[in-house]
Swiss-Prot record:
Chain intervals for the UniProt region annotation (Head): 9-324
Residue numbers spanned by region Tail: 1220-1259
Coiled-coil ranges from the UniProt annotation: 325-1218
Protein name as annotated: Cingulin
Species for this entry: Xenopus tropicalis
Principal location listed in the UniProt entry: other
Main function: Probably plays a role in the formation and regulation of the tight junction (TJ) paracellular permeability barrier, possibly by linking ZO proteins to the actomyosin cytoskeleton.
Keyword GTP-binding carried by entry: no
Motif (ZIM): 41-55
Amino acid sequence: MERDLYGDMADQPIPVGQGVQIRFINDLKENGKPRGKRSKQDSYGVAVRVQGIDGQPFVVLNSGDKAKSSYDYDRHYSERSSTLDTAYSQSSRESAWSRGSQKKTDNGEYPSLGYRSATSQQSTSASNKTNKNGLSTSSFSNQSSEDIDTKPLSSVDSLITKFDVKGQVRGRTARRSQALKDERKRSQSLDGRKNYQDTADSREISLQQQNEVPARRETVSSANRSFARQSLEREDINKTRLTKEWLDQGGEEPVIVKQQRSVQSEFQLKSTPDLLRDQQADGSDPTREMIFSILRDGSTENENNLRKKTSILLEKFPSLQAQPGEDTRSLGSQKKELERKVAELQRQLDDEMKQRMKLESSQGRPKAGMQRLEIQLEESKEECSRLKDLYDKKKNELNAVSQELMEVRMGKEQVETKLRAMEDKLMDSKEELSHLRAKGGTSPDKLALMKELEEVQDELDEVLQIRQKQEELLRQKDRELTALKGALKDEVANHDKDLDRVREQYQNDVQQLRKNMENVSQDQLSLETERQKINQVVRNLQRELEESSDEINQWKEMFQKNKEELRSTKQELLQMKMEKEESEDELKETKDRFSLLQSELEQAKKGSVDPGELASVRKELQRVQDQLKQLSVDKQKVEENLHQRERELSALKGALKEEVAGRGRETERLREQLQSEVVQFKKDNENLGRESQRIQDQLKQVLLEKQRHEEAVHQRERELSALKGALKDEVSGRDREAERLRAQFEQDAMQTKRSYEELVKINKRLESEKVDLERVRQVIENNLQESREENDDLRRKILGLEAQLKETNTFCDDLQRAESRLKDKITKLETERKRMEDTLGEAADQEQELAFVKRDLGNKLEEAQRSLKRLSLEYEELQECYQEEMKQKDHLKKTKNELEEQKRLLDKSMDKLTRELDNMSNESRGSLQVLQSQLEEFREKSRREIGEAQKQAKEKTAEAERHQFNSSRMQEEVQKLKLALQELQVEKETVELDKQMVTQRLQNLEQDTESKKRVQDDRSRQVKVLEDKLKRMEAELDEEKNTVELLSDRINRSREQMEQQRAELMQERARGQDLECDKISLERQNKDLKGRLANMEGQQKPSVNVSHLEAKLQDIQERLQSEEREKATLLSTNRKLERKLKELNIQLEDERLHVNDQKDQLNLRVKALKRQVDEAEEEIERLEGLRKKAVREMEEQQELNEQLQTRLKTMEKESKRKPIRPAHNDDDDLSSDGEYGGSYDPSSITSLLTESNLQTSSC
């Protein structure tokens, strides 16, 4: 409703009204009698008519108590002054009702929160009310952010042409018409009235007097008040910890409570008792009745004419017929929506705190990424609170400036009331003169009185002319002020919309950040579970490796046992061989004997046969046959033992085969499991990389959103500074109009300037914090880059492990092939065994072939020995392969430990970074708290000074009123002298205030220089810290270079060792070839000897050389065995050397890879160090530029200080030299021309203000 009354009425093209009419009811007199004492201190009633922008009258109803209200109504320009006066008196009666309704809300709101008392609102006027209403209504509009005008403010003339198109002249063009006596009596009847007291009795009396007020509206207003009280109680219950801290820190109302209070005040203003009084029970238009009652009071016209005039006014202004129900419903819905939003935000905050508590309880030590995000969230919250504080401060300063403007306007109105009182006195004197003329008579006293009256009339004409000029100036100033107020209103509305939009956007960003934090926490938990799974798998693999090592040890023990058994069987075989040789010798001896016996028998047959000898020969033959039988039995036993040993050997071979097959299956299973774990590890690593990239993108988005917020805040601050500039111009104009309040305004201007400088400092600090955040972000990005490089190193190591796995697979294949070869050899041995069995069967049947069987057995034994040697060698190779596998497992364990060590180092570095970030945030918080405390102290001090100045101003106004009341009874000469004295005192006070202002400015400049010195010292300390960091980095770089040199020395030494091993290997190979040649020659000799032996045995002729040859053959066999043993030892040593060479090659390759990795890491670290050095150099250059800039600013401030000091000295000299003006120039103490002759003309004031603006801009 108020928007329609204020906005739509301003759009109608109505003729511009004339003048400003103000009447203090308590100052009116009746028949020249002095007014009586006031019934109560500071109690008065005032009716003010101020002409609006487009001719719209604006009425302020004010009283001395704590309430205030304002209404708009339309009037014709052609109404005469008597109607205006009566309308004002009627409106003053209506103000009592508005005070009664308003006081209830002012005293009922927030009784225990310690907010500002309502006494500071006594001097506010209608323009402030309209501005506040405009702000409250425009804050709920849905305009977009593109409608904001970011261009600089236009000039005052363009604003006047924008808001005031019509060019008619305001003010009175003629003298004020004489007021009727009954109207003055009516005004005098209001003087003795007491102030309206908001008690139950007064409300009952007022309600009895106003019978037209329907009961329905009272129930609605009481319901609204109860609803507002309940909502406030709910809000007080739902307040959070932050809100309580805000309430404990200061008396400022929160923004939401202010909005609710403005909504409640608007809702209550729409149902004030004076409007309810004029509403009829039959549902007639209250606006029509109000306009009719205004026109009817003090008018002598007919009622029908007045009705026609009201209808014409309503036709011209259709916006007055707005329905209040929709507005109140919309305000109620908006209030409910605000309450719902506050409850929802409170609920979200509680949920977030619960989630954070759960996360902290579940997670013992938060990770570095989570800590960074929490730190950024806390910094964004602190930045939001700082922005809110700045917004509240600016809003409070704007309200204070508007209140001070209203106080200036009230002072102007008081001056105008004094002028009207003088006019009333003149009218009374004219009436007395007319009465005297009517009576007749020309006495000399009457002639003297006539002359005095004519002189007084001439003086009054001069005063009126001066007053008309002053009104013309004031009219122009009012038009400028209204234009500026319109522009200010639009700017403030747009600013509030932008702030609401920024607040909503910030809330959305905070919610998005919370969601991102929850997602990060969930991802972190999932990563933790995956890491636990991987650790479990690694532990299982370690356990399996330990079990496999235990099994390998058991197999080694079994193999050792089998080896010992084989050695024992070999010894037994050798013994059996020796026994067989003995038996063969015996058999030879028996054969020799048998041949001798045969020869003897033949000789005996040839000769004479002796029966004794024949019996002895037969006995000898029987004995030889028995020996042969015994030898055959022994041979069977030996054969049985051989069969048993072969069976044991085949069983051992089968067990060994099964063992090798089991080990192959186990290695295959381990290989598959390791491959699956490697694939899973790769997947987890890729997920970690993607997660880190996503977190980095989220951090970039948060930083971009923060930059946008900071840009919006800077834009709002620029707009506020522009608005402050307009307000300063307005304040300087009002200071020229009201000289008495200039000091207070200048102090307020200085305070706003200091607050602006503090805001600029805070802004710089915010920029520095932004730079620090950028630096921290770069550090985080570098750490992420390092983590990616480490992930690449891990991938390379995993590839190396896969290559090692492939080598183990190939080794397993080689083992399987060796196993197949062993199987073939075993089959060959079995076939040979069968063949040996056949030959042994034939030897049992034919004793003649014992020699051939003996040779075959010898050959087979030799082959068995060679096979046993080969088996033992293959077993040793297998054992060496197992040892190599164990070494590879140890190497894998070492690489795993190195990876864990690197991970621990990474965790330590991340913890160190988080601690540094915490320290930086704590330092920034501490500095911010110190600045806030200093700012609060400065504000308290300025408030106390303003309160003292206001008290002094009130005391001075009271003294001025007393002097004025006494001066009305004194003569004109005394009054002129007193006025001259007052002007001198005012000028002296202005000079003193100017001096104080200059001293304060000097103090501020000194403080600025000290702060800049401190900043310079801090920057020098930062430069020193950066230099120390550079030195530290250079030392680390030297250490890394030394480590690289040591690694290169180790590589050279290992290469030399490899060359030595190769030379030894070549020597061993040459020796092996020589031994092979010797072996081949010995085998040839052996074959020759065996052939010769076979020929000798085939001849069946005993010879003396047989034994010699057999001994020689045995020696040759022993030499051959010893050479074979030496050859076996040489082969084993050769294999060992080859294995060592392979190991050295592998070790060299690993060291080369390790050196390359370290070289890459060192290159990356060198690049990072160079980048840090470049950043440090850039930071040093930037600090040097800032230092130079600060020095230049300090020099400029010193120059300004010197200029101000010279200006102050010249002003003091001019104030001392200035003489007292003559009395005839000081007739009118309220003329605005008197202040142009002083030491402060408008040009000097504007120059000072421009200098202050220049100073703030340079800061």
